[in-house]
């Protein structure tokens, strides 16, 4: 663009830069898929972005305890944020068996809830539980009843949670009053709602001789042969419902996430689908072990059946059994960790994936994605240590480590730490370049960064000026990684190479609109084995 001149002197013209700055991609956005709160999830089957566990409680109802609906998802999200996580996507699922066809009626919004009916004079108070009651039973007490029976307090207890509503009154008039049962409780309580029975709320309350009992809608699952609500179809889909890991699914449409978790799920078909999905999305999948798997086989004279040792689950000795799928985009962590359940106050085993994902995020923030998320600095928070069956010594871990099983260990004076950084292909000689978690995650980070930052190249003239601009942009990005200590080598030329010229893009490529870019780099590998050699100097005199 020419400069319009009029007076003798100096004119300044700002020119657009031909260089394009590359913005690094995020590294620790986690995606969680699993069963969410059966009564308080706003929308099942939809990916929702959250930035705290408070956000999770808003959209998915928070923690719960149930022996029918698996509660690993909320526990994993809870541990993720406690251990350093900051951003996540969550897809909450409802067991398809609770659909009202061949199992219990659909639970929660638009369906049914467990109920408890308290009789009053001329009517009743019908309480609906907003929490599963098959594992923890809510307690509802009407106390401090005035002589007239028209004023009383309601105390609701569920595990460690207690709610008190004082000065509730009967009867309920035609116009809502601040002390009506439904006005005081509904929309405020996280544990129950209340409604009038078929005869209305009644006029007064007199304590009964026997306490009323809950009617649990999920109890029919036992009668129909379902001891658990789990089904692989909830994750993989069926003829009428697409799976979470299929193209154009709600999670597939999320532009970028880095970590994929299916907390507590060990079904081979679901794990295989999750790993394949992670590979397609350039993400890394953190796999949980079976909850009861011990570190080593239980020796005789233990009575059968005994839980399958973790190494036999990864590589079964029995012909025809499914092996844990191999993938450079995944890692297995073992064992389950003990942690206090905020719902019940009891110490229970929890799947390790949520803890580990938080450690990934914390390590990325403090050291970088190229640092192995393992070592004494990876102190796992909110756990009292591994379950007893997962406690091991160095020799026992050595056997597991060679089978790509990353262990969580408790060391005296340190606490519980991540003590392994191998991918699922580490034991395969054909995939040794992807043996270590940080090497694979650094590669995925570079791929995601370049994919997001090179869109400007599309439809540009495919010739030398474009090639120079591409090389300049990528080289600047790789140089920044080198200066942060992400790459091996004493000089930039030792650490990385970027080529985009006539040697990578031929005239034939140009003719069909292809530009080829070659980015080579030398990743840092973790010091997994530290060998100390000690020699004694012979012939020395005492005190020399």
Identify the function of each model-found stretch.
Residues 2, 90, 167, 171, ...:
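Detector for intrinsically disordered, low-structure N-terminal pre-sequences
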Residues 1-115, 126-128, 157-160, 245-544:
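Structured, hydrophobic secondary-structure cores that serve as assembly/anchoring elements
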Residues 205-244:
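Long, low-complexity, polar/charged, intrinsically disordered or flexibly structured peripheral segments
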Residues 189-191, 196-210, 214-219, 442:
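Charged, gly/pro-rich, cysteine-poor intrinsically disordered low-complexity regions
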Residues 52, 170-171, 187, 225-237, ...:
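Short, solvent-exposed coil/turn linker segments
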Residues 181-184, 198, 207, 474:
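Gly/charged, well-structured mid-domain segments that form the phosphate/adenylate-handling core
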Residues 55-58, 110-191:
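Extended, beta-strand-rich, solvent-exposed assembly scaffolds of outer structural proteins
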């Amino acid at each position: 663009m020419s400069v319009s001149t009029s007076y003798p002197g100096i004119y300044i013209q700002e020119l657009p830069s031909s260089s394009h700055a590359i913005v690094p991609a995020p590294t620790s956005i986690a995606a969680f898929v699993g069963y969410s709160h059966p009564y308080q999830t706003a929308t099942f089957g939809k990916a929702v972005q959250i930035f705290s566990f408070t956000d999770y409680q808003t959209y998915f109802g928070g923690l719960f305890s149930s022996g029918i609906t698996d509660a690993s998802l909320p526990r994993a999200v809870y541990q993720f944020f406690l251990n350093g996580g900051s951003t996540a996507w969550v897809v909450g699922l409802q067991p398809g068996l609770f659909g009202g066809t061949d199992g219990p009626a659909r639970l929660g919004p638009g369906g049914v809830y467990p109920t408890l009916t308290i009789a009053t004079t001329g009517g009743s108070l019908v309480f609906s539980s907003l929490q599963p009651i098959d594992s923890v039973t809510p307690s509802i007490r009407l106390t401090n009843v005035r002589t007239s029976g028209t004023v009383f307090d309601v105390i609701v207890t569920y595990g460690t949670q207690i709610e008190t509503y004082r000065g509730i009154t009967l009867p309920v008039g035609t116009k809502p009053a601040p002390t009506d049962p439904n006005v005081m409780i509904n929309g405020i309580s996280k544990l129950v709602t209340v409604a009038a029975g078929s005869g209305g709320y009644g006029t007064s309350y007199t304590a009964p001789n026997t306490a009323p009992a809950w009617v649990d809608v999920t109890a029919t699952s036992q009668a129909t042969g379902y001891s658990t609500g789990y089904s692989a179809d909830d994750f993989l889909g069926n003829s009428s419902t697409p799976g979470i890991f299929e193209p154009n699914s709600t999670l597939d449409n999320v532009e970028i996430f880095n970590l994929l978790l299916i907390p507590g799920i060990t079904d081979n078909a679901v794990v295989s689908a999750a790993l394949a999905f992670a590979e397609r999305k350039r993400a890394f999948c953190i796999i949980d072990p079976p909850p009861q798997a011990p570190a080593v086989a239980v020796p005789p004279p233990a009575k059968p059946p005994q839980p399958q040792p973790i190494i036999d689950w990864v590589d079964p000795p029995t012909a025809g059994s499914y092996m844990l799928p191999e993938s450079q985009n995944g890692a297995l962590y073992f064992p389950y960790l003990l942690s206090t359940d905020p719902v019940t106050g009891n110490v229970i085993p929890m799947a390790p994936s949520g803890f580990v994902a938080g450690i990934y995020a914390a390590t990325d923030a403090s050291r970088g994605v190229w640092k192995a998320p393992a070592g004494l600095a990876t102190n796992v928070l909110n756990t009292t240590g591994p379950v007893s069956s997962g406690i091991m010594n160095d020799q026992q871990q050595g056997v597991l480590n060679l089978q790509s099983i990353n262990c969580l260990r408790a060391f005296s004076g340190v606490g519980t730490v991540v003590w392994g950084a191998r991918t699922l292909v580490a034991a395969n000689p054909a995939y040794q370049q992807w043996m270590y978690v940080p090497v694979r995650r650094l590669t995925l980070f570079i791929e995601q960064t370049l994919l997001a930052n090179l869109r400007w190249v599309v439809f540009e003239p495919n010739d030398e000026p474009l090639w120079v601009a591409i090389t300049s942009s990528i080289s600047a990005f790789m140089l920044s990684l080198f200066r942060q200590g992400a790459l091996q080598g004493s000089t930039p030329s030792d650490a990385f190479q970027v080529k985009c010229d006539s040697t990578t893009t031929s005239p034939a490529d140009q003719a069909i609109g292809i530009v080829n870019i070659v980015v080579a780099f030398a990743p840092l590998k973790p010091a997994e084995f530290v060998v100390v050699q000690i020699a004694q100097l012979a012939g020395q005199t005492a005190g020399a």
